[in-house]
Every structure is written in C-alpha cells, then in structure tokens.
Swiss-Prot record:
Predominant subcellular localization, coarse grouping: mitochondrion
Function: Central component of the receptor complex responsible for the recognition and translocation of cytosolically synthesized mitochondrial preproteins. Together with tom20 functions as the transit peptide receptor at the surface of the mitochondrion outer membrane and facilitates the movement of preproteins into the translocation pore. Docks tom20 and tom70 for interaction with the general tom40 import pore (GIP) complex. May regulate the TOM machinery organization, stability and channel gating.
Protein origin, superkingdom: Eukaryota
Name the UniProt record assigns to this protein: Mitochondrial import receptor subunit tom22
Record localization: Mitochondrion outer membrane
C-alpha cells in the first residue's frame, strides 16, 4: 500500500500565519473603534443628569441589607444628636437662671459693701481734715 504524505511549503505557512495575525489585528482594531463609540454614548446624558439622579442610582448599587444598616445608623445618630441638643438646652437654662437668681443679689450686696466702705473712708478723711484745722476740737455733726 502506498502512503501519501503532503509536503507543506514553509513560505505558505508563514503567509497564512501572517494573514491570520492581520485579521486578528483588524478585528481588535474594529473592537476598539466600537468600544470608543460606546464610550462616547456613555457620556451623552451626563450633562442633563443631576446629583439627585446619581444618588438615586446608588440605590441599585448598594445592597438592601447595607441600606437598612445605613438608615438605622443615620436614625440612631439623629436621635442621639437630638437628645444631646435637648439636654444642652435644658442645662443652659438651669445654669443661666441659677446665675441670675444667685448672682444678681450677690453682685448687689458686693456693690452695697463697696459703697459702705467708700462712705466710711470719706468720713475718716473728713475727721482727718477737721483734726488738721482744729486739733482736739470735736464736731457736732460727727459722733466720736
């Protein structure tokens, strides 16, 4: 029996490989062109899109369990800050009214004490002036 064997020319193999490579490069180049076209179409509506639309689109990205956790955390933080603000307001009310009820009478008594001290000093100065004018004489207006 006779065996047939095909002898392949090396130049033919190289030419075929080169055409395959050229076809692949052409296909890749075509895909790049199509991809760049789709990239441009991705940016077409961005100028009309608002920040609210973008935030609403995040709803689709974030899973439900995470959204629930985030909402619960925000609610807890809001409640805590609200209670802290209420406590701060009530504390300021107590401190300010206490300062007024206790501080004003105290300041008035200090002022009265200062006036009394000033009056006593004036009396001593008058006595000293009388002693210089008439040594040993007593004044009828001021008791000794």
């Amino acid at each position: 029996m006779v065996k047939l064997e095909e002898v392949v020319d090396e130049t033919e193999v190289q030419n075929e490989q080169q055409t395959v490579i050229e076809k692949d490069q052409y296909i890749y180049a075509q895909e790049d062109v199509e991809e760049s076209d789709s990239d441009e179409s991705d940016f077409e509506g961005l100028e009309e899109e608002t920040i609210i639309d973008r935030i609403a689109a995040l709803k689709e990205i974030v899973p439900v369990t995470w959204r629930v956790k985030i909402a619960d955390g925000a609610k807890t933080a809001t409640t805590g800050l609200s209670k802290l603000a209420q406590f701060g307001g009530k504390s300021m009310w107590v401190i300010s009214t206490s300062a007024l009820l206790l501080g004003v009478p105290f300041m008035m008594s200090l002022e009265e004490e200062a006036q009394l001290t000033e009056y006593e000093k004036q009396i001593k100065d008058q006595r000293g002036a009388n002693e210089v004018i008439a040594p040993g004489a007593t004044s009828g207006a001021l008791p000794q």
